[in-house]
Amino acid sequence: LMEDNEFSQSYIKKILDKLKKELTIDDLEDFDLVQKQVVDWIGETIKIADIKLKTRPQVIVLVGPTGVGKTTTVAKIAARYNPIASDHPLRVCLLNADNYRIGAKDQIETYASLLSIPIASIDKDGDFVNKVNSYGTDTDVIIVDTLGCSHKDYEKIAVLRRRLDSKGAMPEVYLTMTAMTKASDMKEILQQFEIFSYNSVIVTKLDETGCIGNLISVLDEKNKSIAYL
């Protein structure tokens, strides 16, 4: 069953070793018990990030490959804190650092308009710090959308890293990936985006796949936590 759900062989071995160590022979013959125990252990390996607003303003930056749903996720996070939709409203602002994708600016500006929150663009190196400072300390949360970068496009990743130079500030950076990404690509993506010192991972498009063993296996192997689903 774990193979059918695309768990890695090393992850499966870890679970099997745990079964042999912690369950009796009689226990191993009880399928329902074994299944419950395996599910519990899988749950224990999934690390959940502790999301707290540590500073004011708290700057949240989403990075990741093209087409993973960063802009939509930015809107969802903004709505979570938005005075209209939240039980604990905060003052939220958006920054857009995606000036490459056609329609990207219009899309995020539409979200900002629907949520009635301010938005500004990061157009060149140095803009990031200036725009964050322009919002001032009366802002609680600043969420930054960025251009999608293939994990193999080292030049574009380097450009985005310069564009997001925070001059000593410590934004919360989240790597955004889809649940449908194959395991080998996940490992490469996790590695190539380390340049951003991301805090944890946001997983998107869970509703578009029936198997997430690859995701659980890779995140466990690389010791990465999940911030949002």
Residue ranges and their predicted role:
Residues 1-89, 96-99, 110-111, 115-117, ...:
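Primarily NTPase-proximal linker/entry elements flanking Walker-type ATP/GTP-binding cores
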Residues 8, 65, 95-99, 146-148, ...:
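G-domain G4 guanine-recognition motif of GTPases
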Residues 44, 48-51, 179, 186, ...:
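Short, flexible helix-loop junctions that flank or precede catalytic/ligand sites
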Residues 63-66, 92-103, 110-128, 132-160:
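Switch II (G3) loop of P-loop NTPases
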Residues 89-92, 172:
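Residues at the starts of beta-strands that form the adenosine-phosphate
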Residues 103-106, 213:
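Short, glycine/polar-rich helix-capping loops at beta-to-alpha or helix-loop-helix junctions
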Residues 111-113, 128-136, 153-225:
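Conserved C-terminal guanine-recognition region of P-loop GTPase G domains, centered on the G4
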Residues 116-120, 223-228:
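Short hydrophobic/aromatic-enriched beta-strand-loop microsegments
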